[in-house]
Amino acid sequence: MVSCTIDIRVPVTLKGDEVRKMCEDRLEDENGRIEIHMIGDSLFFPRESPLVNALYKAYVDVTGDTENKPMVIGGGTYAKSLKNIIAFGPEMPGIDYRIHSADEFILVSGMEEAVLVYMEAIKNLLAI
């Protein structure tokens, strides 16, 4: 018997159950089986979403930066377990925070600015 662990990022064009079915069908062709511990849909909101706009407005109002736009990244987040929520973080342009590395960091000034963005974001979200 051979076993392996696979960490799949579900594309925004598919549902988690569709990916599960594709894996099951493929393994069945090879007389294999799959045991899925957790699978869910991807987390994605279009740029025009009121949530994205509220968060982006908070960022622009605090930083004055209109050049950098919201970005979508592939990654896991516990935000997926809640409805109508977006993962929103303090990564500021121009700084390599070495995210998820042994020497990951954030500048104190960056954290202070992020807190101001979060405060503005909460006000904007409450207004939706």
Language-model segments: residues:
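Transmembrane helical segments that form the transport core of multi-pass membrane transport proteins
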Residues: 6, 28-33
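Midchain, well-structured core segments that form catalytic/ion-binding scaffolds
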Residues: 1-24, 40
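Active-site lining segments that contact anionic ligands and/or coordinate catalytic metals
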Residues: 1-3, 29, 83-85
